[in-house]
Amino acid sequence: MLNLVALSLGIEDEALAQIGSSSGYEYVTKWGTQGEGPGQFDGQNDVVPIEESFVIVPDYDNHRLQKFSDNGTFIATIGTSGELEGEFDNPHSVDVDSDGNIYVSDKDNHRIQKFSSEGDFITAFGSEGTGDGQFTHLHGIAVDPVRDFVYATDTENYDIQKFSTDGTFLKSWGSEGEADGQFSSLESVDVDSQGNVYVADYGNDRIQKFDGEGNFILKWGTPGSADGQFDGPAGVAVDSNDNVYITDVNNHRIQKFSSTGSFISAFGNEGEADGQFVQPEGLDVDSEGNIYVADTGNFRIQVFSQ
């Protein structure tokens, strides 16, 4: 997807030092600054690469999506502030299905919007409330492209909801608490090749894993800053080998785990240099293993190879 050889020629020794020479990751590129113009951000909480094509970033407080080439060249803006079809009130998370259609958690409009890969509005579903198919604080979203399911997390309803890709409500699970299958301040969600669902249980500093029907499988993580510990896990991304990547927000780093929760590696620390982060929230991994990180506090996207 990325021309990593060409891009990596510009990598500075400082960037490699920030990542760590033994981490197995290399800084590739970055883009974005704070602002309202094209290619600028105000609260980018997620990022998703669409294979061999482009990258979509929800620009939260600018109430829009931005579309870039895979090396960060600005292409287009999708949406404006509002409540109508194709408009947003704090779009938080984004994912795509196997056809390249884009799904957006339109948080303060309490709905999910679906667009074509070109940004044309297709449909919307959801409303404000606590019932089936309703949202109070819609947050993360993930599409299972093999089985055509959409999963969404709700921070204040403490649940995960499952839909078909046309917006039909299928089921939900979860409640407030610390027990298995309970949550405290839900963040992102993603799905592996087997249809298992991984959720960032931010307030409990852990990751929980379920099957596609909501049955609890396992959990990992405790509060702290050591390997495998978290201080606010937010973003979740599963790669083609079912490894799980987590943005550890207040530890300003990315951690990588096996599908059973075994710690593999970590990279990043607090700062503004290449390879450093300030409260990174969202991330995704493309088919070649390149990691795209929404470096939220630095108002930029960073890309790494491994």
Where are these regions (language model features)?
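Gly/Pro-rich loop segments of beta-rich domains
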Residues: 20-45, 73-92, 121-139, 169-187, ...
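Beta-strand-rich domains and repeat architectures in extracellular enzymes and scaffolds
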Residues: 36-53, 57-60
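Residue-level detector of Asp-centered blade-edge/turn motifs that repeat once per structural unit
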Residues: 49-52, 96-99, 143-147, 191-194, ...
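Conserved beta-propeller blade signature
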Residues: 54-56, 101-103, 149-151, 196-198, ...
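A short loop-to-beta-strand structural motif that recurs across blades of beta-propeller domains
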Residues: 63-66, 110-114, 158-161, 205-209, ...
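Short loop/turn segments that connect beta-strands within beta-propeller blades
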Residues: 69-73, 116-120, 164-168, 211-215, ...
